[in-house]
Amino acid sequence: MGKLQDGIAIKRINDAITTFKNYKLDELEQGGSMAINTLSNVRAHVGLAWPAILRNCLIHTSSHLGFMKFMIDIATTWKVGAFTLLGSVGDEDPFTDVDLIYTKTCLHLGLKDNDFLQFPEEFAYEANSFLEAQSMNARVDMLTGVHNIEDKYVFRMQSISKFLKAYYTASEDVAYLTGFIKPDDSKDSILSAELLKAQVTSEVLRVRNLITTKIQKYINLYEDSQLPHFRQAALSYTQDWDVDGGVPAALPQPDITDDESPVTNPGPSAPPVSKGADQPEDEEMIRKKVETSKDAPPKAVPSGNVSARGIPAFLEDDMSEMDAPDGFHDYLTREHENNFDLAQLGLAPSV
């Protein structure tokens, strides 16, 4: 594959960031989705750098919401091969430094290159381990792997469910996540920081609500399915999310946008909507507050030894048994001699 020139490398990451910035829920359900096609194309050309690109999209404020919608889509779609979108293509890394290229891409797009969410160290490590593991385990050999795709689907959904649960737990303290926001004493800086804090808070609350709502919908649809792989995945979700007792929510929930309409009778696991004092403020409220207060209180700096990107190095020895590399290779193509319908399976093409 060889190393990519900076211009081409920036173009690949540019496509990923832009796609996640505009990602709508249920993109996977649409035939010929431009967003899914773009992500598949990026994935096919970045080799083993794919999990690192996804990691950066997870923690950067511009792409965080879209990335999490993407993960929720994979966790709740009927397309059993959609998880292959998390797998890398090939055995080479064409990037010399993914984080550096990501920083250059942010500058190219007019984004701040230091606006990364500050996740707790435990989740940062778990997220990195998860993405690295899926890079190998979400691959499918078209010659042999497609015949046991349902079994592989169940294991992948169990892993994704645990990732979403870890995110749900780690996102309870939004003040910690926004600890990177440190304005100076100018009104413009204070206003910008408050707006970004409100944006991040609103997006995190929205993701938390989407996770529980969509997981509950999946359980309702498939817990009694005649297809064993759907039934097993629904059972796993039921155990992970304790739907009978409800998933506790420490934060209020925002209003649902058009592409995130609530399901009918979502059940007890959907956290209640709160309109109390902790509800995120809109831009006008924040602007007035900043304009009328010259002495803004200092921003609290969260404790913990976590870097701006908060991701420790992944160690293969720490991979769980379920996520150990299983030897599958990615030879996915759009056509196969047995004429499998990859669109129906939801298998991501590798070329």
From Swiss-Prot:
Compositionally biased spans, kind Basic and acidic residues: 285-297
Record key words, sorted: Capsid protein, Host cytoplasm, Outer capsid protein, Virion
Organism domain of life: Viruses
GO cellular component terms attached to this protein's record: host cell cytoplasm; viral outer capsid
Compartments it resides in: Virion; Host cytoplasm
Annotated region described as Disordered, given as residue ranges: 246-308
Pfam families to which the protein is assigned, alphabetical: Phyto_Pns9_10
Membrane-spanning parts: none
Family under the similarity heading: Belongs to the phytoreovirus minor outer capsid protein P9 family.
Function: Minor outer capsid protein.
Protein name as annotated: Minor outer capsid protein P9
Organism whose genome encodes this protein: Rice dwarf virus (isolate O)
